[in-house]
């Protein structure tokens, strides 16, 4: 008689335990054990519990290949899900085999687990294990299916595929959702207290293993409801018309101020702060260094000489690499939208900036269209104060549109969703790349589904607050993806290509490159352990299918993007994985976390403009300026969104935090520890630097970076 000892750990999530019966079967090279119930005196499989059981066999099973968990009904109780963290099996000879699980087991089913040792398909030769890989991927591909949201968009998860699964896989709360109004058959409706329609059905059927935890869901709701109801009670969400005074905007979130939001309120109209935001604001990727001026921006030396001062000229500064351009060409053909029944307006400005001898980036000239001419004057710092302020505000509106739609949602949320989907569909649990990337996909499918249900749906928040609306968003993102390249995706390459390596006080660049290097070193150690040669990469058909699916579904097979459709060397794999992890974590933090800080003062980030751009100088008054800014209710709706997305809900996992131990070998565990130590040193350096800054830059402080796109 051979006795195997099982140590079963149940997750500590709310309702992670189960009353259902759990049975186990061990499968080894010499046979398999009888199906045996895991039962002991008292409650089994309670949340957070660690319990030990015995499985008896007539003879030893040899090397353990699989552990089957069978979940079946207990008496008359209703079925409930069980979150199994991990199981350790100790053989009669004392050797231990670890089985990571870290998933919800829902309904009555059988789940097969492999030992925690990561293996590529080339390292498996047993038909049993090869068949297990194949069946696992077939099941996942049936569950996680691709869907087209709009032409030219990265493909997204098809939530309806979860609805088609058996009823015990659904999260059915339809009858518990209080709906104030439903005026169509799509499920697009208003909820009490929320200022936009929500696509309810798409939120109710998330597969358990990609759904927010109860803690995160509760935290998100508790962040949203008080702010939304507070505005509703004060009548702000229903108040149309212009702001009477700029100072009135201060009172929207009087209890939700931050040091940075207060700093922005005090300094937003200063030219130096306008330039600072191109380096360390929420969209720090727009600047390109110029060696000559584009013909569409006919700025002359006489125009800017008063700012440049004696001893230099525009041509000299161009040759020195001190002139930069922010070009919003992508907005030139963007459709416009109506808000509160009124036509809104969009411009495609060109903003020329100069790095002065003191290392301060200053705006030199602004043209509010892509076509120069008498009706498109070039605004200068020497113009009257309100004319110059209005021109800068138009640029800030363009910044808002490009940042929110492309830099933020397209390049982090949507692309990271495609990475998550391909990882789930093409890599089995035992694959080393799956183990590496899984923590960086956490909650991404859920948060993007929420975004599509609340922001991108018809009459959702995008239609309520932005000058381009939902149709403009679709245009902007599809155009942005058509021009997005692998160089843009890889931070070091992007920095070099944009010519911004030497700008001082560019904290996003400095902190980002440090984090990139730390991730690259960590990934390199993992890859070298599992892929010792070029052939090991080229012959991994699962890895190649994963890369190919990302190329086809995220980048629509566009060769000009420069994204690989196949990987040939470990070095190429390291760069690709580094870029994915960086963009799922650090890049998202850089472009997301500061939205409330920099947008709470609405004139610094207006979501829409209500008057056409000026065609002459000298006509701007404070009244006309206020009449150009968004209306009161539009402002409040947008600031509510800024507040929510800047407040990371509970259940956070900072970059480098891996509580789920998917890697069980010693080498990758040591690499994880070294990665964490490196991030700790980066954090220490950032905090020391910030002590001497008037406005600290903390968005890339590793403890403040979430592992994944989860909000």
Curated annotation (Swiss-Prot):
It is found in: Cytoplasm. GO terms for biological process: arachidonate metabolic process; ceramide biosynthetic process; establishment of skin barrier; fat cell differentiation; hepoxilin biosynthetic process; linoleic acid metabolic process; lipid oxidation; lipoxygenase pathway. Its EC number is 4.2.1.152, 5.4.4.7. Keywords: Cytoplasm, Dioxygenase, Fatty acid metabolism, Iron, Isomerase, Lipid metabolism, Lyase, Metal-binding, Oxidoreductase. CDD domains: PLAT_LOX (cd01753). InterPro entries: LipOase, LipOase_C, LipOase_C_sf, LipOase_CS, LipOase_Fe_BS, LipOase_mml, PLAT/LH2_dom, PLAT/LH2_dom_sf. Residues 120-711 form the Lipoxygenase domain. Disruption phenotype: Mice die within 5 to 12 hours after birth due to defective skin barrier function loosing around 2.5% of body weight per hour. Dehydratation through the skin is increased 4 folds. The outside-in barrier acquisition is also affected, the skin remaining permeable at 18.5 dpc while it is impermeable in wild-type mice. The stratum corneum is more tightly packed while other layers are unaffected. Hyperkeratosis of the skin is observed but it is not associated with defects in epidermal differentiation while the ceramide composition of the epidermis is altered with an absence of ester-bound ceramides. Its cofactor is Fe cation. It catalyses: a hydroperoxyeicosatetraenoate = a hydroxy-epoxy-eicosatetraenoate; (8S)-hydroperoxy-(5Z,9E,11Z,14Z)-eicosatetraenoate = (10R)-hydroxy-(8S,9S)-epoxy-(5Z,11Z,14Z)-eicosatrienoate; (12R)-hydroperoxy-(5Z,8Z,10E,14Z)-eicosatetraenoate = (8R)-hydroxy-(11R,12R)-epoxy-(5Z,9E,14Z)-eicosatrienoate; (12S)-hydroperoxy-(5Z,8Z,10E,14Z)-eicosatetraenoate = (8R)-hydroxy-(11S,12S)-epoxy-(5Z,9E,14Z)-eicosatrienoate. Binds 1 Fe cation per subunit. One of its GO terms (molecular function) is hydroperoxy icosatetraenoate isomerase activity. Disulfide bonds: none annotated. Gene3D superfamilies: 3.10.450.60, Lipoxygenase-1, Domain 5, PLAT/LH2 domain. Non-heme iron-containing lipoxygenase which is atypical in that it displays a prominent hydroperoxide isomerase activity and a reduced lipoxygenases activity. The hydroperoxide isomerase activity catalyzes the isomerization of hydroperoxides, derived from arachidonic and linoleic acid by ALOX12B, into hepoxilin-type epoxyalcohols and ketones. In presence of oxygen, oxygenates polyunsaturated fatty acids, including arachidonic acid, to produce fatty acid hydroperoxides. This is Hydroperoxide isomerase ALOXE3. The lineage of its organism: Eukaryota, Metazoa, Chordata, Craniata, Vertebrata.
């Amino acid at each position: 008689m051979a006795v195997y000892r099982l140590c079963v750990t149940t997750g500590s999530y709310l309702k992670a335990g189960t009353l259902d019966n759990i049975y186990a079967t061990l499968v080894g090279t010499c046979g398999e054990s009888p199906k045996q119930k895991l039962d002991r005196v008292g409650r089994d499989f309670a949340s957070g519990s660690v319990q030990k059981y015995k499985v008896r066999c007539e003879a030893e099973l040899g090397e353990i290949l699989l552990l089957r968990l069978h979940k079946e009904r207990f008496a008359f109780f209703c079925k409930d899900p069980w979150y199994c963290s991990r199981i350790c099996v100790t053989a009669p000879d004392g050797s231990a085999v670890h089985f990571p699980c870290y998933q919800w087991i829902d309904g009555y089913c059988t789940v097969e687990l492999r030992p925690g040792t990561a293996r590529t398909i080339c390292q498996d030769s047993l038909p049993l294990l090869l068949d297990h890989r194949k069946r696992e991927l077939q099941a996942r591909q049936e569950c996680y299916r691709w869907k087209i949201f709009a032409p030219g968009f990265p493909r997204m998860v098809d939530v309806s595929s979860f609805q088609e699964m058996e009823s015990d896989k659904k999260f059915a709360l339809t009858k518990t959702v209080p709906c104030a109004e439903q005026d169509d058959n799509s499920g697009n409706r208003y909820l009490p207290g929320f200022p936009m329609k929500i696509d309810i059905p798409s939120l109710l059927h998330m597969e358990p293993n990609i759904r927010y935890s109860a803690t995160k869901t509760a935290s998100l709701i508790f962040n949203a409801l008080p702010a939304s109801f507070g505005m509703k009670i004060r009548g702000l969400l229903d108040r149309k018309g212009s702001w009477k005074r700029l100072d009135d905007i201060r009172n929207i979130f009087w209890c939700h101020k931050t040091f940075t939001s207060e700093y922005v309120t005090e300094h937003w109209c200063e030219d130096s702060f306008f330039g600072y935001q191109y380096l360390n604001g929420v969209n720090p990727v727009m600047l390109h260094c110029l060696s000559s001026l584009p013909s569409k921006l006919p700025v002359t030396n006489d125009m800017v000489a008063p700012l440049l001062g004696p001893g230099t000229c525009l041509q000299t500064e161009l040759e020195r690499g001190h002139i930069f351009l922010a070009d919003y060409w992508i907005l030139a053909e963007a459709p416009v939208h109506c808000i509160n029944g009124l036509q809104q307006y969009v411009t495609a400005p060109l903003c020329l900036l100069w790095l002065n001898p003191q290392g301060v980036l200053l705006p030199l000239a602004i043209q509010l269209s892509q076509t120069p001419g008498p009706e498109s004057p070039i605004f200068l710092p020497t113009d009257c104060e309100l004319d110059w302020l209005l021109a800068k505000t138009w640029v800030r509106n363009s910044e808002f549109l490009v940042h929110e739609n492309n830099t933020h949602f397209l390049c982090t949320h949507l692309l990271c969703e495609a990475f998550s989907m391909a990882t789930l569909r093409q890599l089995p649990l035992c694959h080393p790349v799956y183990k590496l990337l899984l923590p960086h996909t956490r909650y991404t499918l859920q948060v993007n589904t929420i975004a599509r249900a609340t922001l991108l749906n018809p009459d959702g928040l995008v239609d309520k607050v932005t000058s381009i609306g939902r149709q403009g968003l679709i245009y902007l993102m599809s155009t942005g993806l058509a021009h997005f390249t692998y160089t843009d995706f890889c931070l070091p390459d992007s920095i070099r290509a944009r010519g911004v390596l030497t700008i001082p006080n560019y904290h996003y660049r400095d902190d980002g490159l440090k984090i990139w290097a730390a991730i690259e070193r960590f990934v390199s150690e993992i890859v070298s352990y599992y892929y010792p040669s070029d052939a090991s990469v080229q012959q991994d058909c699962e890895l190649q299918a994963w890369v190919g699916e990302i190329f086809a579904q995220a980048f629509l097979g566009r060769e000009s993007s420069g994204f690989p459709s196949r990987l040939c060397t470990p070095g190429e794999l390291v760069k690709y994985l580094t870029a994915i992890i960086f963009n799922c974590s650090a890049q998202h933090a850089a472009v997301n976390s500061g939205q409330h800080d920099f947008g709470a003062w609405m004139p610094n980030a207006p979501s829409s403009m209500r008057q056409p751009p000026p065609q002459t100088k000298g006509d701007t008054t404070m009244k006309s300026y206020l009449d150009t800014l968004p209306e009161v209710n539009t402002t409040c709706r947008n600031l509510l969104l800024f507040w929510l997305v800047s407040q990371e809900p509970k259940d956070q996992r900072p970059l480098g935090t891996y509580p789920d131990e998917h890697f069980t070998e010693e080498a990758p565990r040591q690499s994880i520890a070294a990665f964490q130590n490196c991030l700790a040193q980066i954090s220490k350096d950032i905090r020391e630097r910030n002590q001497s800054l008037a406005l600290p830059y903390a968005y890339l402080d590793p403890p403040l970076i979430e592992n994944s796109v989860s909000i």
